[in-house]
């Protein structure tokens, strides 16, 4: 079974770079305090690293 991580959006995406908004959508985040579980892959880690200032990660 793949390892999963919990990602929570902590800040708004309004006024952010379009690439960062797309990263949030790719992670499945829609609003502040929305939490999703995603697989721990290099692809998702890259998206999380790009928007690190808007999300909180729990291993």
Swiss-Prot record:
Q: Which UniProt keywords apply?
A: Ribonucleoprotein, Ribosomal protein
Keyword Transit peptide tagged = no
Per the record, the GO terms for biological process are: translation
**SUPFAM superfamilies named among the record's database cross-references:** Ribosomal protein L30p/L7e
In its UniProt record, a GO molecular function of this protein is: structural constituent of ribosome
Domain of life (superkingdom):
Bacteria
Q: Which Pfam families match?
A: Ribosomal_L30 (PF00327)
Q: Which GO terms describe its cellular component?
A: cytosolic large ribosomal subunit
- Tell me if Ribosomal protein is a UniProt keyword of this record: yes
InterPro entries for this protein: Ribo_uL30_ferredoxin-like_sf (IPR036919), Ribosomal_uL30_bac-type (IPR005996), Ribosomal_uL30_ferredoxin-like (IPR016082)
**Family per record:** Belongs to the universal ribosomal protein uL30 family.
* Quaternary structure note: Part of the 50S ribosomal subunit.
Descriptive protein name: Large ribosomal subunit protein uL30
């Amino acid at each position: 079974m793949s390892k999963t991580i919990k990602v929570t959006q902590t800040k708004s995406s309004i006024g952010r770079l379009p690439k960062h908004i797309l990263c949030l959508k790719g992670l499945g985040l829609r609003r502040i305090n929305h939490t999703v579980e995603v697989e721990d892959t290099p692809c998702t880690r890259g998206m999380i690293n790009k928007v690190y200032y808007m999300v909180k990660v729990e291993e």
